[in-house]
Amino acid sequence: MSSMVIGLASGSLEKLVVTSTVTGGAVALDMDVDIYLLLGGAYAFRKDVAGGGTYNDRPELAEEMAAGMTGNAVPAPLDSLRALKADGTVRIHCCGTAGKIWGAGALEDFVDLVDDIVGIAEYISRCEDADVVQVF
């Protein structure tokens, strides 16, 4: 089975939507997907942050994007990832250093989508072995 690794370095809504959409395509193609939450990605998955007012890379487009998602029944990215984890092989790993930077050093500091906390060497190793590597 082929595999994809995604390095999610941003916690912006755009990057979260792109990550969930690309993951959906990979699951549809029967690929294993490993998502590594790097700095901003780790922040977006903190329990006290997730799902609430994710920032946009282009704030002037935030309202239009929200309306477009609602009007086209595009699910919230974390809801989409939850469904994809149920449908395919999707694992979400948090970089330990990123978690510590945001004051979240333990697994219980993150939403239940996060499978584990790992070192950056694991991310690099998985990138070496993956068929497809994406960074958002």
Task: Provide a role label for each language-model segment.
Residues G41-T54:
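N-terminal beta-loop-helix "entrance" segment that forms/cooperates
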Residues G51-N56, F110-L113:
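Short, hinge-like loop/turn segments at secondary-structure boundaries
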Residues V5-L16:
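Short, glycine-rich nucleotide/cofactor-binding loops
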Residues G53-G88:
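A glycine-rich helix N-cap at a beta->alpha junction
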Residues N72, R82-A86, V90-L107, V111-V114:
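Ligand-binding beta-strand-loop-alpha-helix segment within the catalytic cores
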